[in-house]
Amino acid sequence: EQKRLLGSQYKPQNNLIGGIPVDSEYIIFVIDTSGSMFSYAWERMLRELQATLNIYPRVKGIQVMNDMGTYMFSRYRGQWIPDTPGRRKVIIDNLRNWAVFSNSSPVEGIEAAIRAFHKPGQKVSIYVFGDDFSGDSISHVIDTVDRLNRSNDRGERLMRIHAVAFPVYFIMEPAKQHPNIIRFAALMRELTHRNGGTFVGLNDIRP
């Protein structure tokens, strides 16, 4: 579709689509599987995940885990899922009913992804989908990720971190204060900024 709109001679100059760097060869999804996400934002999450896959027509490997670091496919624990159209469909199909335990904090999943797949010379993007952060310390998370996701000799982080925030509580309970949502946004803005990624805050949870 992009080629049709921009013409067959169009070539991206900086590997950006919609402001998101798409130069990675591997992608990891870290998905909040808490009750609030699964009950109210799941269809929208599936749509966002599919849209993300679409901007990477072919990569060398994919991985899916929840915010606790639980792998969707345990047999691929610590390994890349080969990227084929069939496997992409299986990922989407399995996600529809994937309601595993979650503490509604992306920290464990991000750390597990970096520890398992951080490898020099391997371009990886982590996509975090969530709606709140129930952890204790934002600064501790940032310091830990800084330590795990080290820079190369050009000062670039080896793994990009992107994030999409789903406004579940703002929409379901608009009259209440929701500090964990604000903390999630603050955490992910800082992590994406420091790790070469993009933060997207949605304004709706409808698909």
Residue positions per predicted region:
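Short beta-strand-loop
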Residues: 61-94, 115-119, 139-142, 173-188
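Sec-exported extracytoplasmic/periplasmic mature domains
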Residues: 35, 50-58, 96-100, 114-122, ...
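Pro/Ala/Gly-rich low-complexity, hydrophilic intrinsically disordered segments
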Residues: 1-25
